[in-house]
Design a protein with these regions (language model features):
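Cleavable N-terminal export/targeting peptides
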Residues: 1-44, 252
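Short glycine/proline- and aromatic-enriched beta-strand/turn motifs that initiate or cap beta-hairpins
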Residues: 30-85, 244, 250-252
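Residues that define the transmembrane beta-barrel architecture of outer-membrane proteins
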Residues: 46-48, 83-87, 137-143, 157, ...
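Structural signature of outer-membrane beta-barrel domains
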Residues: 57-61, 110-114, 166-172, 210-216
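Flexible, solvent-exposed loop segments that connect beta-strands
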Residues: 64-80, 112-136, 171-181, 217-237
Length: 252
C-alpha cells in the first residue's frame, strides 16, 4: 500500500502540471479581436529553424516477473515506489514539411535517477520485512525524432500534438549491482503542447510520454556467480522496460 500511495501521488502531480499547461494554452487563446497585431506572423513560414529546450523528466521501470522461487522459498518482486524529477537539456532543429506538419530533431542530455525496491512476496504479514533497495543514476544521451502536427493559429497561440521515436544511450559509469541494465534503448513517444508567439521568439511548453520498446535487463550475470543473494533478483525477472514522462520548455 505504501508503494501504491507514492505512485498515485506522483501521477497526480504530473497530471496537475499537464492540466495547468493546457489551461494556460486555452486562456491565451481567448484574445479579444483588435487587441493588437500578432507577434511574429511569419515565424511558421521558415523552411527550417533552430532552438533549444530545458525541462524535467520522470523515469519509471515496468517489471515483468517470472515467478522464480529460491531454494529457501523466497519469491522476489521489484518496483519503483516513487518518481524523482530529473533535468534535461536539448538543442532543436525544426524542418517545415507542410502548413500543419514539422519534422523535429532534438538531441540532448537527460540527468536523473530512480529507486528500485525489491521485496520477498511470500513472507508472512507478521514477519520482519525482507527487502533490498537499489539507487540507479542515469546520464542519457538522447536523440528524439518527432513529427509535430499543429492546429490553426489562434492569435499568438497554436496547439499541437507530436509522435515519434527516441533513441537513448546511458553513458554513466556503472558498478556491479543486483540489477544491471543495457545502455541503449528505443522509445515510442507521443505528446502535446502549445506554441506561444512572443515578440522575439516562440515559447513552447510540452508534455511527452515515452514508452520503452526493448528489454533492458542484463540476464547473463557471470559477475554474480559467487553471490547468489544478489543474483536471485535478476533470476526473478522475465523482462524490464523503461517509461518516461518529459516536461519540456522550448525556446525557438
Amino acid at each position: 500500500m505504501r508503494f501504491l500511495r507514492k505512485k498515485i501521488a506522483s501521477v497526480y502531480r504530473v497530471r496537475l502540471l499537464a492540466t495547468v499547461i493546457m489551461m494556460a494554452c486555452g486562456l491565451s487563446a481567448l484574445g479579444r479581436p483588435g487587441d493588437k497585431l500578432m507577434n511574429r506572423p511569419y515565424a511558421d513560414l521558415k523552411r527550417w529553424h533552430l532552438g533549444f529546450s530545458v525541462g524535467l523528466h520522470f523515469q519509471d521501470l515496468k517489471f515483468t516477473h517470472n515467478g522464480f522461487i529460491t531454494a529457501d522459498g523466497q519469491q522476489w518482486v521489484a518496483e519503483v515506489p516513487g518518481y524523482d524529477p530529473g533535468f534535461c537539456v536539448n538543442v532543436l532543429a525544426d524542418l517545415r514539411l507542410h502548413q500543419y506538419f514539422n519534422l523535429r530533431v532534438s538531441p540532448g542530455m537527460y540527468f536523473g535517477s530512480k529507486k528500485v525496491e525489491m521485496l520477498d512476496y511470500n513472507q508472512s504479514p507478521d514477519a520482519i520485512t525482507t527487502h533490498m533497495t537499489q539507487d540507479i543514476k542515469s546520464t542519457y544521451v538522447v536523440v528524439p525524432i518527432d513529427l509535430k502536427i499543429s492546429g490553426n493559429r489562434l492569435r499568438d497561440t497554436r496547439p499541437y500534438v507530436t509522435g515519434g521515436v527516441m533513441a537513448t544511450f546511458d553513458v554513466g559509469k556503472k558498478k556491479s549491482e543486483a540489477l544491471m541494465f543495457n545502455t541503449a534503448d528505443v522509445f515510442l513517444t507521443c505528446g502535446f503542447g502549445c506554441d506561444f508567439y512572443l515578440p522575439y521568439f516562440k515559447f513552447n511548453p510540452e508534455v511527452k510520454f515515452c514508452f520503452g520498446l526493448t528489454d533492458i535487463l542484463r540476464h547473463k550475470r557471470p559477475d554474480l556467480d559467487d553471490n547468489p543473494e544478489m543474483l536471485k533478483m535478476t533470476e526473478s525477472l522475465a523482462k524490464v522496460k523503461q517509461n518516461m514522462i518529459v516536461i519540456t520548455f522550448y525556446f525557438e
